[in-house]
Amino acid sequence: MQLLDGGWVYSPTDLVARMDCDHRTALDLALKAGLLPVEPGEADGMHVLAGKHGGAHERRVLELLRARHETVVEIDQPANSRAALRAAAAQTAEALAAGVDVVFQATFFDEHFRGHADFVIRGADGYEVYDTKLARSAKPGALLQLAAYSEQLERLGYPLPRQLHVWLGNDEIVSRSVDDVLPVLHRVRADLLTQLANGPVIPPRIWGDRRSACGSCHWSEVCGQGRDDDRDLSLVAGMRGDQSARLREAGLVTIEQLGAAPDSARPDTMGVATFERLRAQARLQVTQDATRTSADPVGKVTSEYFSSDGVRLLPRSSVGDVWFDMEGDPFAEGGAGLEYLFGYVTIDQDGEDNPLFTPIWAHSPQAEKAAFEQFVDAMEARLAHWPDMHIYHYANYERTALTRL
């Protein structure tokens, strides 16, 4: 959002932010209005790298389109003023009216909305909008932005595009029906406009509940610190959002309150076993937190068995066991990605006190294939020697990546 000449102007990015998290929008508004005493965090290295590779992908597609089409018009990025935005939007409208094949960085501005579409390309059915993304699939946010641009084309008098197109890093073009996305766009836009009309306010609680969008949000550090400072229930390992909401309604708002809660504090909407498990987890974490020091930031970790079923599922240890981790660069090879490290730890050489780490590096698709083959061969050899061995890994990334390879 921007305040231009006293009025709010929103962008497709703001629509995506509102779709992901209304709290983010509230903080953004308060910040722009100068109401907040805190600032959002700086972009981390991954976001900077993503922007760099995304820009390179966009320029590569531009050169590809210039080679394919006779008329490609590039609209310069306008300054942040209504006059400059009007001028850039007029240039875009003139290019479209002239029937050019491609408009790069097409500017749309209707005094309330501003946007810069990567590519507007003329096809058999008229103009349609394309967005370049290094992702391996068309994400909801990209489709929402494309739908907003498509409605801007309709506002200028052109037929509403029937398709939305995402140009992926591997040059695959994923297309989706605009009709599938417009209802979401209309709902999100109505919510955002209502929020803008109500004006900026400082939320009663600076931090927001944890959600999937936190990983890519510039407010994540502020919210995370707020949850830590207030000892929020989201700190309890394994706590779902709906569970914390039920506990808050019952008057339990901190991890300490939950850990010390009597049986009578259980919400009627929560099962006994679930309440007892979450309460025990909170109690263990409170105990650990009390033992943390500057010399020992982890503190004393304790455990409590609620059920041995999960423990029984763990296999017996084997001297041939392997602890495996992979590292990948999702932006390498034009967005196709590259698994550049296959690393594993074994203990059969010198025992558990002296584990051996074996790295297999790959810096090209050919080397990635060779590294994959080397790792699989090594595991098959170990399995032949230790039939009771297992490979341990964290989360599902390794299984998914190996299956893909």
Regions found by a protein language model. Give the residues of each.
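Conserved DEDDh/DEDDy metal-dependent 3′-5′ exonuclease domain
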Residues: 81, 93-95, 99-125, 129-197, ...
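Metal-dependent catalytic core segments for phosphate chemistry
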Residues: 316-374
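A contiguous, basic/glycine-rich beta-loop/short-helix subdomain that forms a polymer-engagement track
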Residues: 279-321, 326-327
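Generic beta-strand/beta-sheet core signal
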Residues: 167, 250, 261, 324-327, ...
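Compact, charge-rich alpha-helical regulatory domains located at protein termini
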Residues: 227-295
